Amino acid sequence: MFTKKINFKLQSSLELLITLSFGLALLLPIVIIAFIQVSNSNTSLTAIESQQAASKLSSVATLVGSEGSPARQLVQINVPPGVENIYVGNTMVSGVGHEIIFQIVSVINSSYITTYTPVNVSGDLGGIATQGTYLVNVSAQSQCQGNPNVQCVYMQPVV
């Protein structure tokens, strides 16, 4: 009789262990999917905030560029987390171009948020790639620093 009681206890413990294993096997993929969804939503939020900041810089650059030199304006932008670098103009050739690029790096991938301006833009905003709120001086110049033969709008952070 004593052995039957032990076998019954072992059997119920084994059944409980199997039931818990099935529960964990079902719960683990749900937890992993939830973490992936949270990561995707954070990346999407960073992309949207970067798009807003780039559009703000682009519209101010267009306004200042249409007024011509010596027009200037201070603009406040919010740099979201995950921004690796901010490129203004064409950094490969002469530093003067028509685009503002936010490079976003996340756990999943790296992406670029780009806005175009009808005026030539140049500048150095790579130093403000960390999360925070910054003031950027946007000024129209008759001779651009990257290429003195071209008029452009120059962007630099206010220190």
What name fits each language-model region?
Residues 9-10, 67:
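Histidine kinase transmitter module recognition
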